């Protein structure tokens, strides 16, 4: 009993066993003297104390101090960086005792505050294309977050009060703009469903960025829109970069702005922006390789199938058809990229499979067009889109076959360097596509033209540009007069000018700097250019044809270049609001046209 008590009194504490007991994983019982343990005495082994496994690191305090200093320096750098970013966006902060979180421009109605804070909700894709009331968060007045000027350094992540440079629209004006967007613009590109019960007040509370984007795209005056665009970009910058937000509201607002943006027509990219774009492209291509476009995935195909069989929204049928058309265009563009990247000494053999592939795409396009319901809403707009996609495929087939040997009527490889049947067929099919595109364009009511998205007007400009090339193509085997008899360039521009002038009389376009005015200006200048060179081009073509046929019967058309529709150089620098741009483009030598 006494031995047991002695042993218990002198048993080693946890982590203080001797080396022998530690290795044997046994309990170490110290003797009353504490110099050795009972197990080592019994086994006649040398009892040596082991080092504590819980020994505190002597440098822990010093390491903590070093870490604190590094964190402090990092916080100073973050503060300097965010201060520079805030000064860059030009926020006009007041010296009030509190600062709100970044806020969008909103309506002052029903006694609610004029600003609300964004949510930090993650990006969630709704089950359908309808924006139901169960989506998003409701913004209450008491949800505003404020910080004191004397708060800690974490407050630098909260921006200064957002003061819009333009007054907020009245409730009635906001409702009118939303109604115009819902009934006159969205039907042409129905990527979302704005039900009638979604008022401007609801969007202001639940989709503030989408509300601001709608307000921007329904501003038709160029000068007024530029102000709205700058405010919209400021909201994107502060929400996506400063607050690092990702929500469905930002996505819908961005899609709305990009779909009806007029920036590409007005030369909004300055020299610094272009240099930055080239620098980014150089870095990506040098270090990351060429970046492909977003690939079509099985999940996307399944989503499109669900929309096809679903009848939740009547406009889904139009949207599905638009997506199918764009997929065909994207697949044809992939064939062009493969043709550009081809290597070897047999370009003909490399091009033949791609030409057959483009024929397959053309057949799929015809089947898709045959499936369009005749009673489909906006069928005229959809037909113009389909004609443009076929025109795009035809021109790619012409470009791919330009350096290849021509094909005979049986599809076999021919000989010689004359413009082959394959290329002649592509060019003439393009003439037919342009004629069909124009016929569908003339059928569109003037009231619908006002709300057409950006890609519609881009297709119009590229179609007329290609018609100019086909009308003046200098090739002995190409009959320009037949093209003019089918689609007369000057008469076509006269009809389009008349159509745009009638559309400009719509009540919403009571300003002198809207997009249709600039497009009319472009067509008017091009008509003057075409009329001045019409007779000269005809005389030169007749002379060149006789001269080429008499001098060299193997003269080909490789010297007469027709660029692809997505490689028109003048489209990259277009500025319809600058007279100097017209002078630079239309004042170029005739050989560049």
Swiss-Prot record:
DNA-binding region: 18-47
Statement on biotechnological application from the UniProt entry: Azasperpyranones display potential anti-cancer activities. Azasperpyranones A, C, D, and F exhibit potent growth-inhibitory activity against the A549, HepG2, HCT-116, and HL-60 cell lines, with IC(50) values of 2.39-14.42 mm, respectively. Moreover, azasperpyranone D significantly inhibits HCT-116 xenograft tumor growth in BALB/c-nu mice. In addition, azasperpyranones A and C can bind with four kinds of therapeutic targets for cancer, eEF2K, FGFR, survivin, and TNF-a.
Main location: nucleus
Domain of life: Eukaryota
GO biological process: one example: positive regulation of metabolic process
Protein location: Nucleus
Keyword annotations of the record: DNA-binding, Metal-binding, Nucleus, Transcription, Transcription regulation, Zinc
A single GO molecular function term of this UniProt record: zinc ion binding
Gene Ontology terms: cellular component: nucleus
SUPFAM superfamilies: Zn2/Cys6 DNA-binding domain
Effect of a null allele: Results in the significant down-regulation of both azasperpyranone A biosynthesis clusters A and B, including the cluster-specific transcription factors ATEG_03638 and ATEG_07666.
Function summary: Transcriptional regulator that regulates both the azasperpyranone A biosynthesis clusters A and B. Specifically up-regulates the expression of the cluster A and B specific transcription factors ATEG_03638 and ATEG_07666, which in turn activate the expression of their respective clusters.
Name of this chain's protein: Transcription factor ATEG_07667
Organism: Aspergillus terreus (strain NIH 2624 / FGSC A1156)
Lineage summary: Eukaryota, Fungi, Dikarya, Ascomycota, Pezizomycotina
């Amino acid at each position: 009993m006494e031995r047991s008590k002695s042993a218990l009194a002198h048993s080693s504490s946890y982590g203080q066993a001797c080396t022998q007991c530690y290795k044997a994983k046994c309990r170490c019982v110290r003797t009353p003297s504490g110099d050795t343990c009972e197990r080592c005495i019994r086994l006649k082994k040398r009892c040596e104390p082991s080092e504590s496994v819980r020994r505190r690191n002597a440098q822990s305090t010093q390491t903590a101090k070093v870490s604190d200093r590094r964190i402090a320096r990092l916080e100073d750098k973050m503060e300097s960086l965010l201060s520079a970013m805030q000064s860059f966006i030009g926020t006009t902060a007041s010296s009030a005792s509190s600062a709100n979180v970044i806020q969008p421009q909103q309506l002052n109605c029903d006694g609610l505050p004029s600003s609300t804070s964004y949510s930090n909700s993650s990006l969630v894709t709704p089950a359908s294309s309808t924006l139901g009331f169960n989506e998003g968060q409701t913004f209450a007045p008491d949800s505003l977050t404020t910080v004191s000027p004397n708060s800690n350094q974490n407050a630098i992540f909260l921006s200064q009060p957002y003061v819009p440079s333009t007054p907020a629209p009245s409730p009635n004006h906001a409702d009118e703009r939303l109604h115009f967007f819902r009934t006159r613009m969205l039907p042409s590109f129905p990527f979302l469903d704005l039900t009638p019960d979604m008022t401007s007040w609801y969007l202001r509370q639940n989709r503030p960025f989408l509300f601001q984007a709608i307000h921007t795209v329904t501003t038709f005056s160029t000068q007024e829109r530029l102000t709205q665009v700058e405010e919209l970009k400021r909201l994107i910058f502060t929400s996506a970069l400063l607050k690092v937000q990702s929500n469905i509201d930002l996505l819908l607002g961005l899609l709305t702005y990009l779909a009806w943006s007029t920036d590409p027509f007005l030369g909004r990219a300055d020299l610094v922006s272009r240099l930055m774009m080239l620098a980014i492209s150089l870095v990506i291509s040098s270090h990351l390789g060429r970046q492909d476009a977003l690939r079509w995935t099985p999940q996307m195909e399944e989503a499109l199938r669900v929309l096809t069989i679903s009848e939740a929204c009547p406009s889904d049928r139009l949207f599905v058809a638009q997506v199918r058309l764009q997929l065909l265009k994207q697949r044809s563009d992939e064939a062009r990229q493969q043709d550009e990247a081809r290597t070897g000494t047999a370009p003909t053999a490399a091009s033949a499979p791609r030409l057959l592939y483009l024929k397959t795409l053309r057949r799929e396009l015809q089947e898709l067009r045959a499936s369009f319901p005749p009673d489909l809403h906006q069928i005229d707009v959809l037909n113009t889109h389909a004609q443009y996609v076929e025109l795009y495929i035809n021109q790619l087939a012409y470009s791919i076959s330009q350096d290849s040997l021509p094909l005979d009527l049986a599809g076999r490889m021919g000989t010689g360097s004359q413009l082959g049947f394959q290329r002649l067929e592509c060019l003439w099919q393009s003439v037919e596509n342009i004629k069909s595109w124009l016929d569908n364009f003339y059928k569109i009511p003037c009231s619908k033209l006002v709300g057409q998205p950006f890609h519609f007007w881009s297709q119009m400009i590229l179609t007329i540009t290609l018609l100019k090339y086909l009308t003046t193509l200098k090739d002995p085997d190409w009959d320009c007069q037949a093209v003019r008899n089918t689609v007369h360039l000057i008469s076509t521009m006269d009809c389009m000018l008349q159509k745009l002038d009638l559309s400009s009389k719509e009540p919403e376009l009571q300003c002198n700097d809207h997009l249709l005015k600039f497009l009319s200006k472009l067509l008017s200048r091009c008509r003057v250019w075409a009329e001045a060179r019409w007779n000269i081009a005809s005389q030169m073509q007749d002379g060149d044809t006789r001269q080429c046929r008499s001098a060299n019967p193997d003269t080909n058309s490789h010297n007469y270049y027709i660029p692809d529709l997505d490689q028109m150089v003048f489209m990259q620098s277009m500025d319809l609001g600058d007279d100097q741009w017209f002078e630079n483009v239309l004042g170029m030598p005739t050989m560049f046209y």
